[in-house]
Amino acid sequence: MKVIFMGSSEFSVPTLEFLIGSQHEVLAVYTKAPKPAGRGHLLTKTPVHAYADAHNVPVRSPASLSSDSERDIIEKYMPDAIIVASYGMILPRWMLEVPRFGCINVHPSLLPRWRGAAPMQHAILSGDAVTGVTIMQLNERLDAGDIFLQESTPIGSRENIVALSERLSSMGGRMLLKVLDNLDTMRSVSQDDAGATYAAKPSEFCVNFNDAADYICRQVRAFYPRMFFFLDGKRVKLLEADNYELAGAQIGDVVNDELHIQCGNGTVLAPKIVQPESKKPCDIRSFLRGFRGCVSNVLQR
């Protein structure tokens, strides 16, 4: 089968790797354009772009897929299917109709639960015990197409988004090949829209100590390594934490000499791994040995 692959993030790479190593032919790879990154603001290719280059697969990075010229290019490829995995761009309606088998998406959730841009993060944040991968047909609605294949896996009690993404991306690549190898005879099933939930992309990563500590711990795992708080006027990233029940102190107060912090609902947050501004991650005891500020209250913005 001849396919076009569309993806951008690290999650996309294993799917492309499975495709390149299979009997199927990858005609071209579509990915987001290089962007400035790092302290030097050097133009940096997406992980998918770099992997495709290393395997001599043609790469395109259009700013939009809606132009007539891009449509001509895709139609000339005459793909049997277009494979999408964490691409980050919306496909126009005409593209869904170009391939013989349409556009097939690798989605990291058990659809219809967690449609949208951040399904893995929301599975962790909501305390889901199980998640998985869905191989589905794309249609004009957000992650609402028919399902070809779905597999589940438990979420580890301390598993963060990095570890979960690595596992699900590998699952997705393997599952996709199973679908492509049997696409002529495989039947799809429609989703139950009544069970749909939506995973919006997060935008706020500052710890709110009014929340319960167990919820904050799930935030830390779901949005790793982005969650942070302010201590003595300086930003500190929170990379790993535990929680327990204890009431009595004011919310935001430090309750012992290990920087355990009173949170909402009679809970306490116990930071384990933190990262001060412009420094490397360290365990909480190492951090406190080198800290010279005031730690009586962390509710500083």
UniProtKB/Swiss-Prot annotation:
Taxonomic placement: Bacteria, Pseudomonadati, Pseudomonadota, Alphaproteobacteria, Rickettsiales
Native source organism of the sequence: Anaplasma marginale (strain St. Maries)
Binding site for (6S)-5,6,7,8-tetrahydrofolate: S109, L110, L111, P112
Family from the record: Belongs to the Fmt family.
Keywords of the record: Protein biosynthesis, Transferase
InterPro entries the UniProt entry points to: Fmt, Formyl_trans_C, Formyl_trans_C_sf, Formyl_transf_N, Formyl_transf_N_sf, Formyl_transferase-like_C_sf, Met-tRNA-FMT_C, Met-tRNA-FMT_N
SUPFAM superfamilies in the record: FMT C-terminal domain-like, Formyltransferase
Function of the protein: Attaches a formyl group to the free amino group of methionyl-tRNA(fMet). The formyl group appears to play a dual role in the initiator identity of N-formylmethionyl-tRNA by promoting its recognition by IF2 and preventing the misappropriation of this tRNA by the elongation apparatus.
Name of the protein in question: Methionyl-tRNA formyltransferase
GO MF annotation: an example: methionyl-tRNA formyltransferase activity
Catalytic activity: L-methionyl-tRNA(fMet) + (6R)-10-formyltetrahydrofolate = N-formyl-L-methionyl-tRNA(fMet) + (6S)-5,6,7,8-tetrahydrofolate + H(+)
Cellular component per GO, a single term: cytosol
Coiled coil: none
EC code(s) of this entry: 2.1.2.9
